[in-house]
């Protein structure tokens, strides 16, 4: 299968790439940071020689980069799976955060998925099959202090995912929203939170991979995951 994963150089994106690479699939991955992407690509190819790893630097907060990345993926074939993972978390209070934070969070966390999907999904529609995963967040489901514009952008991403599900279900295309709680990535380093208190990125990757193993007539609409002891 041809699997497209955005924001795949670290964290959940890299863990998802590993889950599909170990199964020998062909991957198209991207990251905003070229050096991290190069390192991730080399690591994946070395660890999983039976997989084929294609990579391209792209800043998906920019529509032009979404279109360029999408067209590049299509030049390699029709994707079977699209995992919209690109984005970032910036904590803050709505009345105190810096000017333009909302715009940057919407661009990174919503527009990236919107424009990348618009570039790739028409080929899936033509093929009559495909599976799209949108990496939302627990912050898509309820508000919390310091959620700020990040939470707003993730609520919007949930709306995008739900609408996409309704539009594509009669075209043979599955859409799954993924709602992870606290997951240990580099952003937690130095936070004082023990890694054992929160989930591993591999936990989310395993659930995403499992959701792709169902019959064509079955879909997991939502994957909600939290640390065993609950949200922080």
Say what each PLM segment does.
Residues 177, 193-232:
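C-terminal helical subdomain
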Residues 117, 153:
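Active-site helix of classical SDR
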